[in-house]
Amino acid sequence: MKKAFLFTPALLALSINAVSTAHAYDRVYVFGDSLSDSGNNGRYTTDGATSQLYVEYFTQHITGTTLIPSRENGGTNYAQGGAMAINYKFNTQEQVNRYLNSQDGKADPNSIYIHWVGGNDIAQALEDAAKEKDPQERQKVAAGVVVSSATATANQINQLIKQGAGLVIVPTVPDVSTTPRFLETVLTQVLTPADYKELSEKQKEAINQTIHGGLKSVHDGINTFTTPNKEYRRLILEGTLKKIIEILSPNEVEAKYEKLLAAYNQASAEASKLTDTYNEQVSKLIDTKNGNILRADINGLLNEVIANPTVYGIQNTLGYACPYGVKINECSANMSGFAEYQSLFSDSFHPTPLGQKIMGQYITSIYIAPSQVMTLTQVNRASVKSALSSLDGHLQQLRNGGNEQGKVGVFGGYTGNQDKTFTLGSDYQLLDNLLLGAMYSNYKEERSPIADFSYAGRGHVLTAYTLWNYYNNGWLSGDFHYSRTNYESLTRTIQLGEATRREIGSTTGKQWGARITAGWDIPVTHYLTTSPIIQYAWDKGDIDGYRESGNNSTSMHFGDQDYTSKVGTLGWRVDTQLGRFNPYASVQFNHQFGDTSNKLRSFMNTDSSHASAVMKSDKQSTNWRQYTVGVNANLINNLRGFASVTRNDGNSQDPSYNFSLGINASF
């Protein structure tokens, strides 16, 4: 038996550009406090006039527009510094009401909404609780404020959902016990005498000056250190507390230090618990059934940064960058006393521009994640397209010089570039005008179909085909295929400050479908024929949902994906019969009748509410053209070869060029 090898099509440039980018929301509306305020009451970060906030970063990257404060004409950012969920001069309920009233009570379904509030509410809860002497009463008061505020927050989010909001991003509230303000509050309580209220104004002023002097010394001292991890951060914190005791009570250092440390630990635990209660209450009450909600885990991100800040480009997470006593709206990195090390906090409560950028990068990454994963609906077709392109070249050659009845043909080969595909096939000339065949393709590819998303794919394609020649000039071919591809190392790459994080998962994709193609050869000369082409292709595929292996703030899981493709094709081709080498050319016009966009549901791994966001891709190309030139070669005896190149025009889902090389033999 003679051996033959086929070099199947090389899909050299499979470039899926904006096929599955997220549905293009055109606006971002923001409700919240100073963390999100871009100019209504102020800009709460270092060099606020020129520094970009997380909401501005996100808006710019997703919509390509500039976020404007609501106090300006056309502004969509309603956030206000100092805002709480309820019961304050500035609150998010009033912000939401103002927006809805401006829209006749309806929320724009083509917009993104960010609702983030709670830090001031928890701080208020701690302040109110501190007025109570009884520990149980303190806990009761604090819990009451937190539950009421969290309930109001959830109700406002549900109000937006009920009125038609497209997508609501709901970040978790960061742990207030990690802020420098919390440490300063505890130290202030320690430095304030028990009979402070009974003192004269002059005595109070003297004590206040002493307190401010002590806090400034603590601030300046902390800023001389770096905190590369939680352990170092804790050591510096404990050293700070001990230094305070050494100044206040040099004769009772150890006893009073232990008492102060225990009091700090208890207060910190209570503040963390209140933060968790707030976040859990919001998660419990938001309408996850009807709402399209992305629950961004900012609290988890904060803890990750504190645990290993250096990789993000941050050197100090305990202190703050601005000089003590300088208001955040007036703080500049150029002023005297500004921290030498890159800090997480600008002042005692607000993040630095780098902290804002990290939050913006984080929310952007989890927002675009579904669009990255949706590219698999196009990637899943690559192995089939490679196999069928090879089959088309093989059948084209058989139409020009078929096998005799009873002959067996064999072809096989290897394709290598971005993908590597091994193909082995065989066919049998059952009648003088009827061919039956089958082939197997093994597919391997490692690539990045879209920015910051890559995979390793290993697949198998089984194809059965037939070719029927009738009335001398007519021909009809059909094929049926099934493919299964294992996607390993599905990797999302996420930039967070200077850190590069990767979230990894794996899944499986399947596709099955059929094609029928017909043509009629029209003789022009003895050496030249031309033919119309008509084709209909149907494909159905699915990709299993998968869960990324991590449990970080960026870790996600995704639902199942499925698609149906129905493509009709009209074309024309020209063939030559010159002898040993026979060039040919064709043009085809394709139209997609099936799915032109995809949907994908995504979840955050760390979210207890099971909130999910359904993202819809932009529409795919529905009309495109293919131009093919090639040559069939009669080599020696029963050995033949072919080569072709196809140019795709108007279809961003497919490669710009397909190259096919092949050799087949019959015996």
Regions found by a protein language model. Name each.
Residues 27-39, 55-57, 70, 74-80, ...:
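Structural recognition of the beta-strand scaffold that forms the well-ordered cores
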Residues 44-151:
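Conserved SGNH/GDSL esterase-like catalytic core that processes O-acyl groups on lipids
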Residues 123-130, 136-144, 180-187, 264-270, ...:
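Extracellular/periplasm-exposed beta-strand and loop segments of Gram-negative cell-envelope proteins
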Residues 185-273, 285, 292-349:
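Mobile gating loops/cap/lid regions near enzyme active sites that modulate substrate access
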Residues 237-258, 333-425, 432, 507-509, ...:
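Outer-membrane translocation/initiation segment of Type V secreted surface proteins
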Residues 358, 362, 410, 414, ...:
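Outer membrane beta-barrel transmembrane domains
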Residues 376-530, 538, 645-664:
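Outer membrane beta-barrel translocator domains of Type V secretion systems
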